[in-house]
Amino acid sequence: MSSTVTTAHTAGTGSTVITNIAGLVTNSPSFGRGSPRSSKFESGGASPLGLIQDAAVVIDGDRVAWIGESSKAPATDNRVDAGGRAVIPGFVDSHSHLVFAGDRTQEFNARMSGRSYTAGGIRTTVAATRAASDADLEANLTRYLDEALRQGTTTFETKSGYGLTVEDEARALRIASAHTDEVTYLGAHIVPPDYADDPAAYVALVTGEMLDACAPHARWIDVFCEKGAFDGDQARAILTAGRAKGLHPRVHANQLSYGPGVQLAVELDAASADHCTHLTDADVDALASGRTVATLLPGAEFSTRAEWPNARRLLDAGATVALSTDCNPGSSFTSSVPFCIALAVRDMGMTPDEALWSATAGGAAALRREDIGHLTPGAYADLAFLDAPSHVHLAYRPGVPLVSEVWRRGRRVR
């Protein structure tokens, strides 16, 4: 079968062709089984990466117009030589917490030294974030976004959750929404100390006045459904209230223990259940039978020396898996999707193909997007060049800065 894709797009004035690509990862069903549109990686089947050797891609405006073999590339006004490098879709980081101030180095140092630490965890970041100016919060956010972009991330989701007052949660979302459309209201991160004796009153705030202030600035609503945070009934009330305001649900689920989070996520057709470390067979079956994506966050397990989620179990059951950084100052202070890919392959039972698909097409599925996460005609021209001939090097050479060039919306940005 010819690897050239015929499309309704033709190379137009101002279009660009990138040629001499050693291996182009398309995530296209035309080049393997599975696709970002089906949101399924078919475990045990042919790779869905749709890999084209000696490939070319044509970009017209902000979109992919053509993909295929270099020898069959149409003429364009501009030509870029990839120099025998691999090209992949830009990473889709579908879970991060980037609007915050301060850090928690003391907590990390104590944890790595085996000492107990009781200085506040999330509450430490809440205090620092509340005290920070808008300018400081935006400067921090753009710094971490630039870090991520340099490592190949072209789409990201980020959450509030370090304000926990009406004013501070709305402020965080306003700042985030200036940089991404994928903004999540996480007023239900923890119950703040001033509501410790009356968590029901805080749930009422999260589903009432705070929701009213935050909904205009967000696409998603999230809740930390876990012992010590919000139980299943509270999480249901929060997500249902958000959905009534037009926000789509996501759930921090089953990170620290078995619980109702995953089942609730599937029941409410949440786009994603995130963490998914402690799963029953019923949880796995529910994820495999529904649209909810299991978003795995290996940076958290790495940073906390916790039990790894079992990606192999989820994939073999037919669940859709995404990989994301969970970038936050407490439990996963990394903006590097390549690092998370290496961890997933080394410690979570994923193949290099599965891990890359999950960090691109899987992330797109977790955001219910069909215009990103793959390099096929009509998709956004978001892509990363690797200083390597194959995408496998992302897992094969952990810690090496392999991303050498990044394009977003058809323009080189790094």
UniProtKB/Swiss-Prot annotation:
<feature type="binding site">
    <location>
        <position position="97"/>
    </location>
    <ligand>
        <name>Fe(3+)</name>
    </ligand>
</feature>
<feature type="binding site">
    <location>
        <position position="95"/>
    </location>
    <ligand>
        <name>Zn(2+)</name>
    </ligand>
</feature>
<dbReference type="GO" id="GO:0050480">
    <property type="term" value="F:imidazolonepropionase activity"/>
</dbReference>
<dbReference type="InterPro" id="IPR011059">
    <property type="entry name" value="Metal-dep_hydrolase_composite"/>
</dbReference>
<feature type="binding site">
    <location>
        <position position="255"/>
    </location>
    <ligand>
        <name>4-imidazolone-5-propanoate</name>
    </ligand>
</feature>
<feature type="binding site">
    <location>
        <position position="326"/>
    </location>
    <ligand>
        <name>Zn(2+)</name>
    </ligand>
</feature>
<comment type="pathway">
    <text>Amino-acid degradation; L-histidine degradation into L-glutamate; N-formimidoyl-L-glutamate from L-histidine: step 3/3.</text>
</comment>
<feature type="binding site">
    <location>
        <position position="330"/>
    </location>
    <ligand>
        <name>N-formimidoyl-L-glutamate</name>
    </ligand>
</feature>
<comment type="function">
    <text>Catalyzes the hydrolytic cleavage of the carbon-nitrogen bond in imidazolone-5-propanoate to yield N-formimidoyl-L-glutamate. It is the third step in the universal histidine degradation pathway.</text>
</comment>
<feature type="binding site">
    <location>
        <position position="95"/>
    </location>
    <ligand>
        <name>Fe(3+)</name>
    </ligand>
</feature>
<dbReference type="GO" id="GO:0019557">
    <property type="term" value="P:L-histidine catabolic process to glutamate and formate"/>
</dbReference>
<keyword id="KW-0479">Metal-binding</keyword>
<feature type="binding site">
    <location>
        <position position="252"/>
    </location>
    <ligand>
        <name>Fe(3+)</name>
    </ligand>
</feature>
<keyword id="KW-0369">Histidine metabolism</keyword>
<feature type="binding site">
    <location>
        <position position="97"/>
    </location>
    <ligand>
        <name>Zn(2+)</name>
    </ligand>
</feature>
<feature type="binding site">
    <location>
        <position position="326"/>
    </location>
    <ligand>
        <name>Fe(3+)</name>
    </ligand>
</feature>
<feature type="binding site">
    <location>
        <position position="189"/>
    </location>
    <ligand>
        <name>4-imidazolone-5-propanoate</name>
    </ligand>
</feature>
<dbReference type="GO" id="GO:0019556">
    <property type="term" value="P:L-histidine catabolic process to glutamate and formamide"/>
</dbReference>
<dbReference type="GO" id="GO:0008270">
    <property type="term" value="F:zinc ion binding"/>
</dbReference>
<feature type="binding site">
    <location>
        <position position="162"/>
    </location>
    <ligand>
        <name>4-imidazolone-5-propanoate</name>
    </ligand>
</feature>
<dbReference type="GO" id="GO:0005737">
    <property type="term" value="C:cytoplasm"/>
</dbReference>
<dbReference type="InterPro" id="IPR032466">
    <property type="entry name" value="Metal_Hydrolase"/>
</dbReference>
<feature type="binding site">
    <location>
        <position position="162"/>
    </location>
    <ligand>
        <name>N-formimidoyl-L-glutamate</name>
    </ligand>
</feature>
<dbReference type="InterPro" id="IPR006680">
    <property type="entry name" value="Amidohydro-rel"/>
</dbReference>
<keyword id="KW-0963">Cytoplasm</keyword>
<keyword id="KW-0408">Iron</keyword>
<feature type="binding site">
    <location>
        <position position="252"/>
    </location>
    <ligand>
        <name>Zn(2+)</name>
    </ligand>
</feature>
<comment type="similarity">
    <text>Belongs to the metallo-dependent hydrolases superfamily. HutI family.</text>
</comment>
<protein>
    <recommendedName>
        <fullName>Imidazolonepropionase</fullName>
        <ecNumber>3.5.2.7</ecNumber>
    </recommendedName>
</protein>
<feature type="binding site">
    <location>
        <position position="104"/>
    </location>
    <ligand>
        <name>4-imidazolone-5-propanoate</name>
    </ligand>
</feature>
<feature type="binding site">
    <location>
        <position position="328"/>
    </location>
    <ligand>
        <name>N-formimidoyl-L-glutamate</name>
    </ligand>
</feature>
<dbReference type="InterPro" id="IPR005920">
    <property type="entry name" value="HutI"/>
</dbReference>
<keyword id="KW-0862">Zinc</keyword>
<feature type="binding site">
    <location>
        <position position="331"/>
    </location>
    <ligand>
        <name>4-imidazolone-5-propanoate</name>
    </ligand>
</feature>
<dbReference type="GO" id="GO:0005506">
    <property type="term" value="F:iron ion binding"/>
</dbReference>
<keyword id="KW-0378">Hydrolase</keyword>
<dbReference type="Pfam" id="PF01979">
    <property type="entry name" value="Amidohydro_1"/>
</dbReference>
